[in-house]
Amino acid sequence: MTAALIVIDMQRDFCAPGGYADQAGLDISLLRAPIPAIQDLLAAARARGVLVLHTREGHRPDLSDLPEPKRRRAENAGAPIGSQGPLGKLLVRGECGHDLIDELQPLPGEPVIDKPGYSAFAATDLELLLRNRGITELIITGVTTEVCVHSTLRSAVDLGYACTL
C-alpha cells in the first residue's frame, strides 16, 4: 500500500465548546460538520489497510516554539495561545483541548504528529514516517481547510507526494 490518510487537527481546541476556536468566536458547528464524513473515510481507510496518521496543532507549555507573528494573530483574534480556557491552556500540548476528539480517536499504532505550526511537515518527523513506509500518495482531511489542511497539502505537493483533498 503506497497511500496514507492524514487527519488534520480534529482536536478539542478546534471542535469542542470551550476550545481555542470557540474562544476565538468561530462557529464550531461548522468545524464539527465534517466529523461524520471523516468517520466514514477513516473506516474505509482502516478496512483497506491504509496507513492512518493524525495531527494536532499545539505548542510547548513554555510557548518557546510559538513564533511572535502567530502569537499576535491569536491575541488579536481574542484567544491568546497559552491563555487559560475551559479546556486548559489554549493550543498547548498536554492540555485537555489539545487531545483529539472522542469521535475520531486513533487506533493503537496510528501515529499522532504534534506540530507547532500549520503544515504537518514543518518541525515534525512526518516526512520520515511516510518515506520509511514507502508512502507516495496522501489523502488529506480535517479542519481549518484554509489554514492547516492547505498548508500540509502544499508542503506535500512540494515534497513530491500525489495528494487528494
Regions found by a protein language model. Name each.
Residues 1-107:
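Active-site acidic carboxylates
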Residues 44, 103, 129, 155-157:
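Hydrophobic/aromatic ligand-binding patch that stacks against planar heteroaromatic rings
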Residues 47-50, 134, 160:
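Glycine-centered short loops/turns at secondary-structure junctions
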Residues 52, 163-165:
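Hydrophobic beta-strand scaffold residues
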Residues 90-139:
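Internal catalytic-core helix/loop-beta-alpha segment
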Residues 137-148:
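Glycine-rich anion-binding loop/nest that anchors nucleotide
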Residues 149-159:
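Short Gly/Thr/Asp-enriched flexible loops that form oxyanion-binding sites at enzyme active sites
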